[in-house]
């Protein structure tokens, strides 16, 4: 089942997002298993929405690429961990 993730970074900025994206998305391509990615400024920070082909592919990306890079620090990137909401995707349109 497809799996959705919403990450919110309170106080986050476009510049911080761009730094993180460059560090975790190789050559501007989606990670293996990721079907959709969108991001933008929200009321009090920066929000990222992703859909993976399964919960397992999300966990693999999160545990082996995203969170280790965020924890070690990305120059110019977000300085706090995201607030995370996850869900099983009922409907995804192209």
Enumerate the language-model features and the residues they cover.
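Short S/T/G/P-rich N-terminal loop/turn motif that feeds into the first structured element of a domain
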Residues: 1-49, 53-68, 76-94
């Amino acid at each position: 089942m497809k799996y959705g993730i919403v990450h919110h970074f309170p106080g986050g900025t476009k510049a911080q997002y761009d730094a993180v994206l460059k560090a975790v998305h190789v050559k501007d391509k989606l990670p293996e298993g990721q079907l959709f990615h969108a991001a933008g400024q929200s009321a009090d920070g920066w929000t990222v929405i992703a859909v993976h082909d399964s919960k397992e592919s999300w966990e693999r990306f999160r545990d082996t690429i995203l969170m280790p890079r965020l924890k070690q620090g990305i120059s110019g990137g977000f300085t706090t961990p995201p607030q995370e909401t996850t869900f099983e995707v009922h409907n995804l349109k192209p």
